[in-house]
């Protein structure tokens, strides 16, 4: 899975791609071609 700063242009890669929001992050998933998986948003730092 790749991490990108913007998935706006990547939405149109395939007709099966869909944008999903999970736990504050935005994911682009594709059932027909799993190589196209993308995540937007970086990991948050945990407080000690």
Curated annotation (Swiss-Prot):
GO cellular component terms, semicolon-separated: chloroplast; ribonucleoprotein complex; ribosome
UniProt KW keywords: Chloroplast, Plastid, Ribonucleoprotein, Ribosomal protein
Gene Ontology MF, one: structural constituent of ribosome
Keyword Plastid: yes
GO biological process: translation
Predominant cellular place of this UniProt entry's protein: plastid
Classification via HAMAP family: Ribosomal_bL36 (MF_00251)
Protein name: Large ribosomal subunit protein bL36c
Gene: rpl36
